[in-house]
Amino acid sequence: GIIRALEENNIPFDYITGTSMGAIIGSLYAMGYSPDDMEALLRSEDFKRWYSGKVEPKYAYYFKKSIPTPEFFNIRFDFKDSLNVKPQLPTSMVNPIQMNLVFVELFARATAACDGDFDRLFVPFRCIASDVYNKRQIVLGKGDLGDAVRASMSFPFVFKPIEIDSVLAYDGGIYNNFPTDVMRDDFHPDIIIGSVVAANPSKPKENDLMSQIENMVMQKTDYSIPDSVGILMTFKYDDVNLLDFDRLQELHDIGYNRTLSLMDSIKGRIHRRVNADNVRLRRLVYRSNLPQLYFQKIYIDGANSQQQ
């Protein structure tokens, strides 16, 4: 909603940084998606399946399907060698297989076009991931765009982390949930418009697993922008979580209307304008020049010859 309102008022976007959900939205815009394109994707049934990990029935092997149960997860033991029983808990709530495949489809063409340099996207872009072993943020501005976004949104226990440059990368919000410092250090913009849709973890609740995990892993973030640096828009959502994509329209409208209410102030700080038709044309040219996605080789790991 914020992006749509700014575009409609000819406010230019020169750089984008984002963490977690901000990395998803920011990366889509950075690789040439319009607000309409992003809304169509996020509203689609396909997207709901990707972030929930559900498999379409036509792709399920019915003879291997388990009997439906209300269980949250289960643990299986193999007593063939009772001295080496090693029970394993699930690594994530959401099965990552569909999301991993879809991120290749979504981001591979833009990665190829920019040759792994996020400064060469339609809009230069950075996102943040977390190295929990070394207790530090990772600023991602090069490499595979899909992997960067996938890492930035990998909140512990919800989504499985991925490995980037031999580092297990988690959600960037653990150490930096509002990367205005990265925006300043990497891009040196004249004005920053910051959108805050999160807050530092509140006191954990006895029956709320997510609030307990947040308090265990997330460091406090400075959600402020000095007036001399930019404009801050803060949204308080007490009952919205990482997977609430069903409330997209509600959240879009809140962001859109709030941005319009601040438009006079924004225009007073940002004097340069861009022509909407010119932006659409540049976006069309950029998207049309993206290479086609072809799979030349497929490597299968962890399977025997019969399984392959």
Give names to the regions the model predicted.
Residues 1-19, 27-308:
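Patatin-like phospholipase
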